[in-house]
Amino acid sequence: MDAIKKKMQAMKIEKDNALDRADAAEEKVRQMTEKLERIEEELRDTQKKMMQTENDLVKAQEDLSVANTNLEDKEKKVQEAEAEVAALNRRMTLLEEELERAEERLKIATDKLEEATHTADESERVRKVMENRSFQDEERANTVESQEKEAQLLAEEADRKYDEVARKLAMVEADLERAEERAEAGENEIVELEEELRVVGNNLKSLEVSEEKALQREDSYQEQIRTVSVRLKEAETRAEFAERSVQKLQKKVDRLEDELVHEKERYKNISEELDQTFQELSGY
């Protein structure tokens, strides 16, 4: 009987120990389950962040592509402005050559006027010395009149040429104004593009890269942005150079216009002198 009691007590103790071990095992399983749930939650959060990072990188790549396209458009506009400035330079060269030819014609007209004046003086002297030789005086007067008419024709032709030069200069001035407007618009667009690039750069810098691949792609995009910034700076420099060229051309046009006004005044004076000489000869 005592042996049975001892055996039952031992079995009870073993049962209690087994229950304790079972409780400990259940607690351990519960803790491991909670830990596993936390790990799974962290994994889900990490996956969400990775997806957001990928989306941000795709968006940044799209923004960078748009910025590159805009920069190419601006560079194309700058090249067009430079080509237009070169064309204006060629036109200015042609106008200067035409002005030189007009000055040569003016010199010829001036020489004709001097010759006519000299002939008139000679005719006056001869008239006073030999009043009885009216026929010869009349012939000299006719010669002077012919020379005066020829000088007038030359002056009129030169005047027409100068009017044509003035018209062309007005067209060049209008082209220069349009070129300046395009250069200014290009500068404004470049400023806007620079702001867009700055925003893209800030977005790239603010991305949280969680793995090595994302970090490498961000470095690549930042390198592209630096390249685009360098190209943008070059485009701004070229735009500034084009604007300075336009300003120089404008000054040159102003100078040519002043010369035209001066030459027209000289033509006017020559015409008045010719008219006066003709009137004096007609009075004889």
Curated annotation (Swiss-Prot):
Q: Where is this region: Disordered?
A: 112-148
Q: Name one matching Pfam family.
A: Tropomyosin
PANTHER family recorded for this chain? Answer: TROPOMYOSIN
What's the name of the protein? Tropomyosin
Q: Record's family?
A: Belongs to the tropomyosin family.
Which InterPro entries does the record cross-reference, listed alphabetically? Tropomyosin (IPR000533)
Domain comment, as recorded: The molecule is in a coiled coil structure that is formed by 2 polypeptide chains. The sequence exhibits a prominent seven-residues periodicity.
Q: Which residues form a coiled coil?
A: 1-284
Q: Does the keyword Repeat apply?
A: yes
| Native source organism of the sequence | Onchocerca volvulus
- State the taxonomy lineage: Eukaryota, Metazoa, Ecdysozoa, Nematoda, Chromadorea
Q: Which UniProt keywords apply?
A: Coiled coil, Repeat
**Domain of life, per lineage:** Eukaryota
Q: What does this protein do?
A: Tropomyosin, in association with the troponin complex, plays a central role in the calcium dependent regulation of muscle contraction.
